[in-house]
UniProtKB/Swiss-Prot annotation:
Family: Belongs to the HrcA family.
Alphabetical UniProt keywords: Repressor, Stress response, Transcription, Transcription regulation
Gene3D superfamilies given in the database record: 3.30.450.40, Heat-inducible transcription repressor hrca homolog, domain 3 (3.30.390.60), Winged helix-like DNA-binding domain superfamily/Winged helix DNA-binding domain (1.10.10.10)
Highest taxon above the source species: Bacteria
Keyword check for Repressor: yes
Keyword Transcription: yes
Function, in words: Negative regulator of class I heat shock genes (grpE-dnaK-dnaJ and groELS operons). Prevents heat-shock induction of these operons.
Biological classification of the source: Bacteria, Bacillati, Bacillota, Bacilli, Lactobacillales
One GO molecular-function entry: DNA binding
Organism: Lactobacillus acidophilus (strain ATCC 700396 / NCK56 / N2 / NCFM)
Name this protein carries in UniProt: Heat-inducible transcription repressor HrcA
GO biological processes: negative regulation of DNA-templated transcription
C-alpha cells in the first residue's frame, strides 16, 4: 500500500498523462500537487513508484507514464467520478426525451449517444427479457411459398421475419395454425415457452396438416425475440487509437467487434475491482483476452429497470482515457437510461 503522498503523486501523474498524453516530470507534479513538496522529494517518491511497477520511464523522455499496474491501483483506490458540464447532461436529456416505439430503439440510441459524447466505441445491451410475455402472433402470406411471421410482446416490441415454406400452405390452414398458436402462447412469458411445449403443440391436430413447419417458424422468431441484442456504435473511433499503417490490425479489430461474442461476454463478466459492488467496472488492455485490445480499456456499467431486468452499457477507448470523466458519464447515463426505459414500460401497464 502506498503512503498518502505517494498516492497523490501517482494520481497527479495519471490525471496529467490522460489529459496531455505526454510523459510527466517531477516539476509538473510539483506544480499540480495540492500539497507543498520539493522537487527532490517528488523525484524520490517517483523512484519508489517506479520500483513498485506503478509508473515507467519512456526512452524518449525523462518523464514517467503510468503502467498497467499503476492504472489498476488508481482505479481500485483513487479514482473519483467527475461532475460533467451541464451541457452534457442537457444533451443526454434531450436525446433520450424523443418518442421511441420499441425498447431496442432506446438501447440502440443509448449506444449512439455515448459514442457521440466520448468519441469512443460504445456498446449497449437491453434489459433481460425474463418477464416479457407474448401478446400476439400473426403469419402473413407473401406468396404461395413465403410468409412473414410477426410476434408482438408485452414490452411493445414487434419481431418480424420472412420465411420460405417447404410446402404450399393455404390461407385457411395458416389461420387455423395461428389461432391455435395464439390460444396456447399468448400470455406466456418468453421463458415459459420451451421446445417441449412447442413439440406438444405439433402433435395436436388443431393446427392443420403443416403445423410442424409453422411451429418451427414460431420457434425461430421466439428465439430472436428472447435473445439479448448488443448494439455497437462508433467503430470508426477505433482508428483514433491504432496506427494508420497497420491495416491488418484495424481490420481485425472491426471483425472482433462485429462478429465475435467476446464483448458480450466481457460486459457480463465482473472486472477485478476492490469494490465488487461499484457500479462501473474497468478492464484494462492487459486484462482483456485479446492482444488486439492491449492499448484499450473497457468500461462497463449495469443499469437496473426494476422488474423488467438489468442491462449493460460499455465504452471501449484508449487505456490513457480520462477515467474520472468517463466513469462520471457512465454513472449518470445508466441512471437516465433506466428512467427512460421505466417510463417506456409504464405505457404498457
Amino acid at each position: 500500500m502506498l503512503t498518502e503522498r505517494q498516492e497523490l503523486i501517482l494520481k497527479t501523474i495519471i490525471m496529467d498523462f490522460t489529459q496531455t498524453h505526454e510523459p510527466v516530470g517531477s516539476k509538473t507534479v510539483m506544480n499540480q500537487l495540492p500539497i507543498k513538496v520539493s522537487s527532490a522529494t517528488i523525484r524520490n517518491e517517483m523512484a519508489v513508484l517506479e520500483d513498485q511497477g506503478l509508473i515507467e520511464k519512456t526512452h524518449s523522455s525523462s518523464g514517467r507514464i503510468p503502467s498497467s499496474e499503476g492504472y489498476r491501483y488508481y482505479l481500485d483506490n483513487l479514482v473519483e467520478p467527475l461532475k460533467l458540464p451541464e451541457s452534457v447532461y442537457n444533451t443526454i436529456g434531450s436525446q433520450l426525451d424523443r418518442p421511441f416505439h420499441q425498447v431496442n430503439e432506446i438501447v440502440q440510441e443509448a449506444a449512439r449517444i455515448l459514442s457521440d459524447l466520448t468519441n469512443y466505441t460504445a456498446f449497449a445491451e437491453g434489459p433481460e427479457k425474463r418477464d416479457v410475455k407474448v401478446t400476439g402472433f400473426r403469419i402473413v402470406p407473401l406468396s404461395s411459398r413465403q410468409v412473414m411471421a410477426i410476434l408482438v410482446t408485452s414490452d411493445g416490441n414487434v419481431q418480424n421475419q420472412v420465411y420460405a415454406l417447404p410446402h404450399n400452405i393455404y390461407g385457411e390452414e395458416i389461420e387455423k395454425a395461428v389461432h391455435m398458436i395464439n390460444d396456447q402462447l399468448v400470455g406466456k412469458s418468453l421463458n415459459e415457452i420451451n421446445v417441449s411445449l412447442l413439440s406438444e403443440l405439433a402433435k395436436s391436430e388443431l393446427g392443420g396438416e403443416h403445423v410442424t413447419e409453422l411451429l418451427s417458424l414460431v420457434e425461430d422468431v421466439l428465439k430472436d425475440a428472447a435473445s439479448e441484442q448488443m448494439y455497437v456504435d462508433g467503430q470508426i473511433n477505433l482508428l483514433n487509437n491504432t496506427s494508420e499503417h497497420n491495416v491488418k490490425d484495424i481490420r481485425s479489430l472491426y471483425e472482433l467487434i462485429d462478429h465475435d461474442n467476446l464483448f458480450s461476454n466481457l460486459m457480463d463478466s465482473k472486472a477485478d475491482s476492490k469494490d465488487k459492488n461499484y457500479p462501473i467496472k474497468v478492464k484494462l488492455g492487459s486484462e482483456l483476452p485479446n492482444d488486439l485490445l492491449k492499448n484499450y480499456s473497457l468500461l462497463t456499467a449495469e443499469y437496473n429497470v426494476g422488474s423488467h431486468g438489468k442491462g449493460t452499457i460499455a465504452l471501449l477507448g484508449p487505456t490513457n482515457m480520462p477515467y474520472s470523466q468517463m466513469i462520471g458519464l457512465l454513472e449518470y447515463f445508466r441512471n437516465e437510461l433506466a428512467k427512460k426505459l421505466l417510463d417506456y414500460y409504464g405505457k404498457f401497464q
